[in-house]
Regions:
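N-terminal Rossmann-like FAD-binding beta1-loop-alpha1 element of flavoenzymes
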Residues: 30-57
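Short beta-strand to alpha-helix junction loop
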Residues: 85-92, 163-165, 174, 214-238, ...
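Mid-domain catalytic core of redox enzymes
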Residues: 28, 113, 250-370, 400-402
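Glycine-rich FAD pyrophosphate-binding loop
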Residues: 49-74
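Glycine-rich active-site loop/strand segments that organize a redox cofactor
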Residues: 66-90, 156-161
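Conserved flavin/dinucleotide-binding core of flavoenzymes
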Residues: 129-130, 332-441
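Mobile amphipathic helical/loop "lid" adjacent to a hydrophobic cofactor/ligand pocket
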Residues: 90-208, 217
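Helical element adjacent to the flavin cofactor pocket in flavoenzyme catalytic cores
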Residues: 206-269
């Protein structure tokens, strides 16, 4: 869901600030210290190590991957993903990352762009099937488009691309079946922000990188096994093969600076002095980066995501997921032995009693999948600060990758990638950071 057109790319995302923060690649030919092993940090470390740089990756927690990881859940007795993520075949940065670690085959999905939906209120089901090329002839096929949507409604996509910087999705996209049955659920999922507040330009970037490029770029993909098995474990193996060092449970608590350069790190083993050619990629969450590097702007308003996993076996259908209209959940994902539900922009649900929430969602899952019988074992995960709120105000707080320190760059989906907080944005930011420090494309 994630790459945007050149017209919409920020200067940082286009790399117009030059190959390096200070211009000269040779100046930073030493060791690179990558702080934070989420996808942004992993992507930066991977590209730097592949370019022959000595890399040390520090992760404060016990495991790498950040919000994109899998773990064994004792309540369910099986491995589950921390959250549900849907990728598209046109996510260029994510696909390049997976190719670099030899893991593209770990994603699965239909052979063609296929997006099944269910309207919970009416019981109506349909499947959106964009045509392969850029010409949207699928809009004229009743078996491929949104039922009930009038042809004029599709002009909303053009208006979205011309939205002002401050416009919200709700300002730009008119009421109608296209909005209710496609654009609104896509916007809420991509931005993790209600459409009344979600920034229209950020959503336009998502559309520009997916629907606007044609159906061949919109084939939905999900991990066959788990997020860690696709994005984390192969990366750690590749980094080890390239000679990079990965230190988990290793929190960096301070960055020393002198005369416009980062000169030291402080970790659990004490102070680490940087040589003149060394550099840092600061790939922690925004609030942590602002603490380590005072004066760093970062988003300070956040939205939650709720994920619910049921221990149940269901028919995955054609795509392995289904979009829900008119309920609490936006998506239901079906994997062997586990049925998962995702609710985006979920701040409103943080205080709702778990039993009430699960009961409602189980009803939606039953309607979507045809499951019968008593509610199975479940695990509810409320991630309170899942992403920054994708509003105009928060967009203004997203920093470029470069910093006042000539040998320190930023990475993370919260930086100004030109996209909302997504896997594609996180990986893109890591690649940008590596390029700024001289890594080959």
């Amino acid at each position: 869901l994630k790459k945007r057109s050149k017209k919409l790319l920020s200067p940082q995302a286009r790399g117009s600030s030059g190959a390096r923060p200070n211009g000269s690649t040779a100046a930073f030919s030493g060791q690179v210290h990558v702080i934070g092993a989420g996808l942004a940090g992993l992507a930066a470390a991977l590209r730097l190590a592949a370019s022959g740089r000595k890399v040390t990756l520090y992760e404060a927690g016990p495991a790498c991957g950040g919000r994109c990881r899998s773990y064994f859940d004792r309540e369910l007795g099986c491995r589950i993903d921390n959250g549900n993520h849907l990728l598209l075949s046109g996510n260029d940065a994510a696909m390049a990352y997976l190719d670099a670690i030899g893991a593209r085959h770990t994603l699965g999905g239909p052979d063609a762009p296929t997006f099944p939906f269910l309207d919970l209120a009416t019981g109506e089901r349909w499947t959106v099937r964009p045509s392969p090329g850029r010409l949207p002839w699928w809009l004229f096929s009743s078996s491929r488009r949104i039922p009930g949507a009038k042809p004029a409604e599709y002009l909303a996509l053009a208006r979205l691309m011309l939205a002002s910087a401050e416009a919200t999705v709700a300002n730009v996209v008119p009421a109608g079946e296209l909005t209710r049955r496609l654009l609104e659920p896509l916007a809420v999922s991509a931005l993790n922000t209600p459409v009344a507040a979600g920034n229209a330009r950020l959503f336009a970037a998502v559309i520009a990188g997916s629907l606007a490029r044609g159906g061949a770029q919109c084939i939905p993909l999900t991990p066959r096994e788990g997020l860690s098995e696709s994005f984390v474990d192969p990366t750690l193996a590749k980094l080890a093969a390239l000679g990079a060092e990965v230190k988990t449970g290793h929190r960096i608590s301070a960055i020393g600076t002198t005369a416009g350069r980062a000169t030291s790190l402080t970790g659990p083993d004490g102070r680490i002095e940087l040589d003149s050619g060394d550099a840092i990629v600061l790939a922690t969450p925004g609030p942590v980066a602002a603490t380590l590097l005072p004066g760093t702007a970062a988003p300070d308003a956040f939205e939650a995501i709720v994920n619910l996993h049921f221990l149940a076996q269901a028919d995955p259908g054609e795509a392995g997921f289904i979009g829900l209209i008119g309920g609490l959940a936006e998506w239901v994902f079906v994997k062997p032995g586990v049925v998962s539900v995702t609710i985006s922009a979920a701040n409103r649900l943080l205080e709702q009693p778990a039993d009430d929430l699960v009961r409602t969602l189980w009803g939606e899952v039953r309607q979507a999948t045809g499951l019968v019988g008593e509610m199975p074992r479940w695990r509810l995960i409320r991630e309170k600060r899942a992403t920054f709120a994708a509003t105009f105000a928060q967009q203004q707080r997203r920093p470029r990758a470069t910093t006042p320190l000539e040998n320190l760059v930023l990475a993370g989906d919260w930086t100004d990638t030109g996209l909302p907080a997504t896997i594609e944005g996180a990986i893109r930011s890591g690649f940008t950071a590596a390029q700024l420090l001289g890594a080959a494309l």
